[in-house]
Amino acid sequence: MAKKVANIVKLQIPAGKATPAPPVGPALGQAGINIMGFTKDFNARTADQAGLLIPVVITVYEDRSFDFVTKTPPASVLLKKAAGVEHGSGEPNTNKVATVTSAQVKEIAETKMQDLNAADVEAAMRMIEGTARSMGFVVEG
């Protein structure tokens, strides 16, 4: 018989840097999860992705055990890394802050493909291009 799901917790945590401090600790404590167990597992699983923000979906069961699934980093984080900027534009229609090439967009789309609701890479590229434009980036090519 399958375990009954008690709660689902969604967080975005820097890769390899989960700690019991806020915001991770309180969110997991409310769900009744062993915080140290989660942080060790998460940090081990994401050690190779240092510097990126990793979304994680934690499924908590009634017996207080848990499973978690890490997703790919948000498109905005990958775009900022590709463009080499700290943050997007506050006025994306008038103030362009960076440029990304279509090759960079394709690479990001291929990385994000498993988490996007897209039929093929071209559709995923259009989604990533839209995100880039809304951040004040110019897409070349």
UniProtKB/Swiss-Prot annotation:
NCBIfam families xref list: L11_bact (TIGR01632)
PANTHER family noted in UniProt: 60S RIBOSOMAL PROTEIN L12 (PTHR11661), LARGE RIBOSOMAL SUBUNIT PROTEIN UL11M (PTHR11661:SF1)
Protein's name according to its UniProt entry: Large ribosomal subunit protein uL11
Function field: Forms part of the ribosomal stalk which helps the ribosome interact with GTP-bound translation factors.
Single GO MF annotation: structural constituent of ribosome
PROSITE patterns in alphabetical order: RIBOSOMAL_L11
Subunit structure: Part of the ribosomal stalk of the 50S ribosomal subunit. Interacts with L10 and the large rRNA to form the base of the stalk. L10 forms an elongated spine to which L12 dimers bind in a sequential fashion forming a multimeric L10(L12)X complex.
Disulfide bonds: none
SMART domains: RL11 (SM00649)
Swiss-Prot/TrEMBL GO biological process terms: translation
Post-translational modification: One or more lysine residues are methylated.
Record keywords, A-Z: Methylation, Ribonucleoprotein, Ribosomal protein, RNA-binding, rRNA-binding
Family statement drawn from the similarity comment of this UniProt entry: Belongs to the universal ribosomal protein uL11 family.
One annotated Gene Ontology cellular component of this protein: cytosolic large ribosomal subunit
Biological source species: Pediococcus pentosaceus (strain ATCC 25745 / CCUG 21536 / LMG 10740 / 183-1w)
